[in-house]
């Protein structure tokens, strides 16, 4: 990844939840290449350690802490550790999430619906609250919540995920109004079809398995059906998502708050 001179994050620190995932890693790289220190939070300590190791080439401070975003005590502990180690956090990318089961509405399992809501709504709330408290004490900063285009248009067979991401967009709009006077900007990001990566592979395989009227039963055919729905006729890249996060955090977006940035290729 090459540096983009538009953004100078030297001397700043970004905290990224879901730091062991594909988007978390790409975003960490995007900020590190422009000088930001990185704090990773995730439940998967092994994968998170791999990401931290990969960031060493950028010669910026990197910290990693285990955190269950659904647990307020865990989030508070992770923020305390990060602040004690780094002094302050300037940006928070509220990125941890879970796609959940793919199933028709009348067949959707209640237990998995609850799990999706716990991670994608309660988890985002816990991190958003902790981030707001810290940034208020620092006199301001920026938060980006990971939503999804599923929270804009409601895709088939993704009932819980769509519900959770609609909620994230709503929380973002309210938090932006509540926190503006404290100098805290809050925006959300809604990618649509992003790949290659773990979530893209999972999505095509599980949509095919549902057997709905919308998609073929062959994952490869589903992949082509999805790409054909994009006016630009390609997937978005992880780096393009990371670029969206960087823009929303940067001074270039200093008059933008309460905004949901759609990264959709024109969908």
Language-model regions, residue ranges each:
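Residue(s) in the substrate-gating loop at a strand-loop-helix junction
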Residues: 148
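C-terminal substrate-recognition "lid" of short-chain dehydrogenase/reductases
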Residues: 125-128, 136, 232-263
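Alpha-helical segment proximal to the catalytic Tyr-Lys
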Residues: 133, 177-178, 254
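Canonical Rossmann dinucleotide-binding motif of NAD(H)/NADP(H)-dependent dehydrogenases/reductases
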Residues: 7-39
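Substrate-binding pocket helix/loop in short-chain dehydrogenase/reductase
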Residues: 103-105, 109-114, 226
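Active-site helix of classical SDR
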Residues: 128, 164, 172
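Short, small/polar-rich loop/turn modules that mediate ligand/substrate recognition or access, typified
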Residues: 180, 185, 256-258
């Amino acid at each position: 990844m090459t540096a983009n001179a538009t953004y100078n994050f030297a001397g700043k620190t970004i905290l990224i939840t879901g730091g062991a995932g594909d988007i978390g890693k790409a975003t960490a790289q995007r900020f590190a290449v422009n000088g930001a220190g990185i704090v990773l939070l995730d439940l998967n300590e092994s994968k998170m350690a791999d990401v931290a190791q990969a960031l060493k080439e950028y010669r910026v401070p990197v910290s990693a802490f285990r955190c269950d975003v659904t647990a307020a005590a865990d989030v508070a502990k992770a923020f305390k550790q990060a602040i004690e180690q780094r002094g302050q956090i300037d940006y928070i990318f509220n990125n941890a999430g879970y796609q959940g089961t793919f199933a028709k509405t009348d067949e959707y399992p209640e237990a998995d619906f609850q799990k999706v809501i716990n991670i994608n709504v309660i988890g985002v709330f816990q991190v958003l609250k902790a981030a707001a408290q810290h940034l208020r004490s620092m006199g301001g900063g920026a938060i980006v919540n990971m939503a999804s285009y599923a929270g804009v248009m409601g895709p088939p067979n993704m009932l819980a995920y769509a519900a959770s991401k609609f909620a994230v967009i709503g929380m973002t709009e309210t938090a932006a109004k509540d926190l503006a006077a404290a100098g805290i900007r809050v925006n959300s990001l809604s990618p649509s079809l992003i790949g290659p990566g773990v979530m893209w592979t999972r999505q095509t395989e599980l949509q095919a398995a549902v057997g709905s009227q919308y998609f073929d039963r062959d994952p490869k055919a589903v992949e082509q059906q999805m790409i054909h729905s994009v006016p630009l006729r390609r997937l978005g890249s992880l780096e393009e998502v990371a670029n969206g996060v960087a823009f929303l955090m940067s001074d270039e977006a200093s008059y933008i708050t309460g905004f949901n940035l759609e990264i959709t290729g024109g969908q």
